[in-house]
Design a protein with these regions (language model features):
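Structural motif
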Residues: 63, 159-160
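Conserved beta-alpha
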Residues: 72, 76-152, 156-157
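N-terminal nucleotide/polyanion-binding subdomain common to many enzyme families
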Residues: 1-90
Length: 161
């Protein structure tokens, strides 16, 4: 994405910029209706990326932001460069604050049953974001279930998942 700097981490571009720069770019993308994916990468996700081809494919064309100290440390030691961390929970909260101001809606997907609903209540109260839907992440891996989940999310009209 424009205006961001990256470091190459084993073939994966990782954002170097601070959180304000990241939020500015994401805000601009939302303003023009641009579709994008963001992953906040910690050491565990970095390990999966390095060892699992499916993870490598999933992270292709994704804006990858350092989440944890472990990844930041590895980049500093291996590549002799510094990156700014932006933990996923903090990014999610900031995106909800942004969405609350711009009237974008959010669909919360993942975790165990009940967690997304509790998060939705908290986020709506704290940020004013409109929650388009919630769904836990525990489901059957069959294709019909996955298609149903995708349809539910798509029909929600959410701008942010």
């Amino acid at each position: 994405m424009e205006c961001l700097s990256f470091v190459d981490f084993y073939g994966l571009p990782i954002v170097k910029n601070d959180r304000e720069a990241v939020l500015t770019v994401l805000r601009r993308a939302l303003d023009v209706g641009r579709t994008f994916r963001v992953t906040t990468m910690n050491a565990q996700i970095a390990y999966y990326y390095l060892t699992m081809p499916d993870y490598q494919a999933a992270l292709k064309d994704t804006l990858v932001i350092p989440d944890g100290v472990g990844l930041s440390w590895a980049i500093r030691k291996r590549l002799n460069t510094r990156v700014s961390r932006f933990p996923g929970v903090e990014l999610g909260l900031e995106l909800c604050r942004l969405a609350g101001k711009t009237e974008e809606s959010v669909f919360l997907f993942g975790s165990k049953p009940g967690v997304a609903e509790k998060a939705a209540t908290f986020l709506a109260q704290e940020t004013g974001v409109r929650i388009a839907g919630c769904r836990h992440g525990f489901h059957n891996p069959d294709e019909d279930t996955q298609l149903g989940i995708c349809q539910e999310i798509s029909e929600s009209g959410a701008s942010i998942l």
